[in-house]
């Protein structure tokens, strides 16, 4: 059970990394090719210029939400770095709701589920300080599919290893696809599939439907 939990946790983290990398590619494409119509940035480029208005705040959040126009209600969650979450907590803006079994408090902000992940993008300011990218999601923002390998799980034993004591290796094979709604893949991977670095490039995606139909938005703050 413990091994299974560790394996499951590993693949969840890999899935999260690919979601974040793909979101970074969408953001880069949007800025390069669609005038940044999915992005609201209030971040300052130096520590000296940082104020409450350049950090996560209700006005900036609202502006990011309404890059979707009258489809703003389609957003259901926001993913933030832990430092941004700290700002939200300090502002007393987080409301906690219980899950269906009353065992867990789920953080929400303005009705959106809050997901905290330090894998989200942190970039250096031009002069000093850092900028945090938060991602707002709606249902169906990413499509997900999983295939079945011929041998999805197996244990390999090597008797000659471990000074003759033998070792066992667990092999887990996953075949899955993750793709953002409303975008076509335009890049060419160097290998069999896109690396995280390749997914984050502006050349990897191109939006093919109107902005309001894409349930994604970005907010950049200090």
Model-derived regions: residue spans:
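Alpha-helical scaffold segments that mediate packing/assembly in large oligomeric complexes
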Residues: 1-68, 206-208, 218-221
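Structured, hydrophobic secondary-structure cores that serve as assembly/anchoring elements
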Residues: 1, 61-88
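Short, flexible loop/turn elements at secondary-structure junctions
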Residues: 7, 82-84, 118, 174
